Amino acid sequence: MTDELCFASATWLAEAIRTRRISSLEAVDACLARIEEVNPRINAVVRLTDDARERAGQADEDLAAGTVRGPLHGVPFTLKDSLDTAGVVTTAGTIGWRDRVPDRDATVVTRLKAAGAILLGKTNTPEFTWSDETDNDVFGRTSNPYDLSRTPGGSSGGPAAIVAAGGAPFDIGSDTGDSIRQPAHVCGIAGLKPTSGRVPRTGHWPGHQGLFESFTQLGPMARRVEDLTLLLPILAGPDGEDPHVAPVALGDPSIVAVDELRVVSFTDNGIRTPTPETVVAVEAATSALAAAGVRLRTEVPPGLDEAWATLDGLIRADGFAWLHRLIEAAGTPGWGSYATRDWITPGVPLPGDELTALIERADAIRARLLRWLADVDLIVCPAMPQPAIRHGESSASWFGDTYSDVHNLTGWPAVVVRGGTLPDGLPIGVQLIAPPWREDIALAGAHIVEAASGGWQAPDL
């Protein structure tokens, strides 16, 4: 029963708790036992809350009295340590905040708790989320549950690793440059980067950092696509603080007319050649969609190399002065962790006229891609060109991010779902990208791919 609960979807757990087939306390205890079992090897959970079992007991009492708090009543979850939690230490992976205790929850945490979810603990992140290797000087390095010598990705590597390992049914990640999608890919789970402006970032660090933060979106990470669908409506919508969030209605993936979808697929973006196994996974995904009746064509969206270079230029535009300021304000000695030092030390701010030209180019690229998107409903492509790399090789993979980073510039929603598995057990993710505000289409497509591939598989830990 413990394994069944550890590996169940959040959707299944919510229904089982609500119908009293299982108790919330049983679900919480199963997750805590699994964390105790696997965390010494993967180092994904950096802190447990003191009151998870108490809250689970209260959830069970409420249910017995006929009170259902919301769609996640009694369901446990973990949370990336870049998101504030009232009364629970939030470090964002920086030494200066080792003992920092926020006095309020991030908006997404408030919404999850209001929906009845129970916080188990916090998961590891690189310092201020800025690395594709989940490592920091506070808690150390997180490892991939499918191969401990490999990275779980970043920056949401802690969330991806513990969800994949069965320690929590879901977590909330952040994605500035594929930081939900890359870890979902290498850890074999499902992850959603919503449309930019869909989910409030209030209470997430690095915080309001201008151009850098404008590319960031928060989203759910889970073992099953159905859980992304369950969680998005809970997270989405204005909170009266994040000035970039719009009150746009969500579509329902279950009523998407799949046989009317115009789907474009490609396996090679012309920047980084994917492995043969990655090509096979994407082709299998497109075959599954074709069998479902979509109208399919092969084409690479125009100007992906320019789009990626423009995003990279904008992120580097101030020479990472924003990161240096944050590290100083946090009281972290020196230049922060090795990962952030790699970014800060070579940074040279752009002159104003060059920055203006870069912003203009970004808007021109967005406009061109939107015009191209006029007769496209869904894009299917690699999440990354290779599976999880070994620890310490992160910088070598940077151009691999070109498959996913582009959509931090466009702001389009994207889902990654497990589409294949290497002979050694390493997962391969497939990415599905939809037009702005059409998460329903991306999720509907991901559900088809998941059904064909089998989706998440338990690691042999």
Can you say where each PLM-predicted feature lies in the sequence?
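An N-terminal boundary/leader segment
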Residues: 1-54, 291-293, 349, 458-461
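Acidic/His- and Gly-rich active-site-bordering loop/insert found
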Residues: 52-53, 65-137
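Acyltransferase
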Residues: 21, 26-29, 57, 276-300, ...
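A short helix-breaking turn/cap at a secondary-structure junction
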Residues: 193-283, 453-461
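Short helix-loop capping/hinge segments that flank enzyme active sites or metal/cofactor-binding pockets
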Residues: 73-92, 257-266, 314-370, 418-427
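Glycine/threonine-rich flexible loop motifs
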Residues: 90-99, 275, 389-397
